[in-house]
Amino acid sequence: MTTQHSKTDVILIGGGIMSATLGTLLKELSPEKNIKVFEKLAQPGEESSNVWNNAGTGHSALCELNYTKEGKDGTVDCSKAIKINEQYQISKQFWAYLVKTGQLDNPDRFIQAVPHMSFVIGEDNVAFIKSRVATLKKSVLFEKMKLSQDEEEMKSWVPLMIEGRKSDEPIALTYDETGTDVNFGALTAKLFENLEQRGVGIQYKQNVLDIKKQKSGAWLVKVKDLETNETTTYESDFVFIGAGGASLPLLQKTGIKQSKHIGGFPVSGLFLRCTNQEVIDRHHAKVYGKAAVGAPPMSVPHLDTRFVDGKRSLLFGPFAGFSPKFLKTGSHMDLIKSVKPNNIVTMLSAGIKEMSLTKYLVSQLMLSNDERMDDLRVFFPNAKNEDWEVITAGQRVQVIKDTEDSKGNLQFGTEVITSDDGTLAALLGASPGASTAVDIMFDVLQRCYRDEFKGWEPKIKEMVPSFGYRLTDHEDLYHKINEEVTKYLQVK
């Protein structure tokens, strides 16, 4: 049975952190807008935003070495690191505003202070990290970062990583107490709870079948109720596709020119999770290493303290897996169905160019549990097999697109696609993703609500005081804002 519903102002597809953030921003900036949300699963934040489906790192380049690039002359380019840190500052300011205004309570349910650290082995890598820290510390955003090669100091930070270490190779660690662990699933659920209280229609177990533009300029979105099997068509002035790995297939259904010559490559993640509480309680940090030469950015190994429902956990990974699914709950046909006449050359070109990625994935798929444990022992020399179990994390779909220079380029990062008229936006890609959700959604609003955005700026600056500024260039403003953020989020 198919029914036609009346028009709405905004449709958000996907019940993750991106839709939750965009919906919250719109209700703050334009409360009269009628918003509907459609999610395929039974509750919000259960795919990419789920606490076990991502690393929970508040990505701010305090520990992620792949956000800084080393030149042939030994200089380190920190521009990407500064940008990502600035984006995370925006997220923290918005969350602090929501706590301050009573829309989020008990911030420790979704954010915890956890030191962020980098770890390297070998003379060349030690030289790199020294140069990296020296360059980063020129910015106020990284003023609290410490570097050490002193065994006792390093042991005081991460005893498990120093005890039992026998190699003569030099090691170095950085330490920044301002790092965080974020439960994006808990945050997403709370944001949607607030939106429901503000009149937003959030419907679960809803599968979006089609998205088509009308001559009037509005969009028709066909949705199937997975419980009743009824199909309903909704009309909306604006559509946002924030459905994780399912965003690409949904974008392709729109037929907009920006959906052409773009593809996706799914990668799944495996982690080792510690089952020994005594071990878990002796490590309190997110420690990121350096990816092997030739390995993709997604392969950066890290030993992570996590907080889930108030309980501390310890994970190590990721190890790449392969599944043709675009979502953890998706179909094995997702990858095949995403190949279209307009992107087949794009996909094939990427396959030819990215042989190193293919080799990496094959090598990861061949790993035994003992080999995974050997990788862990690079970080934690005394790790015991019996204390760790393998868990499967979420699916990520890496974007493949044509650029002006060449076809089939694999993109690492998060990408916003918008129609020419700004009536539709889609979010594709992976890390840093959720950490930068607020800044990304500001980008969506600027591109899709061009006429209204200028009038919204005073309210935006109330919610995010640094909006329009680069905090790295305004030390006093950073300290003033950070004091407020620390007060409300209860982090450092």
Curated annotation (Swiss-Prot):
Enzyme class: oxidoreductase
Gene responsible for this protein: mqo1
Keyword Flavoprotein: yes
Cofactors that this protein relies on: FAD
Substrates-to-products reaction catalysed: (S)-malate + a quinone = a quinol + oxaloacetate
InterPro entries for this protein: FAD/NAD-bd_sf, MQO
UniProt GO MF annotations: 2-hydroxyglutarate dehydrogenase activity; L-malate dehydrogenase (quinone) activity
Name the UniProt record assigns to this protein: Probable malate:quinone oxidoreductase 1
